[in-house]
Amino acid sequence: IPGADDTPLNAYTVKPGSFDEDRPHAVLMYVYGGPGSQTVTDQWGGRRMLWFQYLAETYNVVVVSVDNRGTGGRGKAFQDIPYRDLGTPEAADQIAAAQSLADSSWVDADRIGIWGWSYGGYMTLMSMLTGDGPSTFTSGLAVAPVTDWRFYDTIYTERYMSTPQNNEAGYERGAPLNYADQMADTQDLIIVHGDYDDNVHFQNSVQMVDALQEANKQFQFMMYPGRNHGIYGGNTRLHLFTMLTDFIEESLIEEEPIIGATD
């Protein structure tokens, strides 16, 4: 799939068994996108892939994942593109990929969502709120997102961004907090965070919630008390993925679920 600068980007799709290339489908893009990472690999995707297959078979959604510039497996020059500019080129690639998909006969351009966790939650917000994102993505699900790199640990952040004193413009440009007012009234957004998150601190989502409220944007927010970055424990995961599935159904799906798929 072509990125923002027409660089070919690695991608995978999870399609329903009844896939028809002449029928428009809703698309859910799964993103991580962080430096040196990969979601597109020649291996089984684990439990998350089971959820993607469930969504595809139950709701006729096509799940797509794209490795933007800055991810791994493509050489140092490719990985170094977001240096001192985290979030900007990566989000531009996700937006460009979504727009390219929108031109396909099997995609309903009015039903393209994006979701991710941690750096992927950050990418979800950046992709929804910057550039052409507000007119490209119908919905977004941001789990444990970074919302300002000043809130994240220095060992990771300064490796890619230098310090705020030496790269103020990069920090400002890469903060979803600064784009809260760009959220379109037609977009649906849910933010999820555990308040004991010791990786991406809960402060990130609190500040994002405050910015969205200040901009009078309507959205959903779920906090998991006593849960860390993985949002595990008790009935938490069942509640989380039931909620995410319901949100996808409400924001992206037009037809009834396939009979028997949820049994």
How would you name each of these model-derived features?
Residues I1-D263:
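Serine-hydrolase catalytic core recognition
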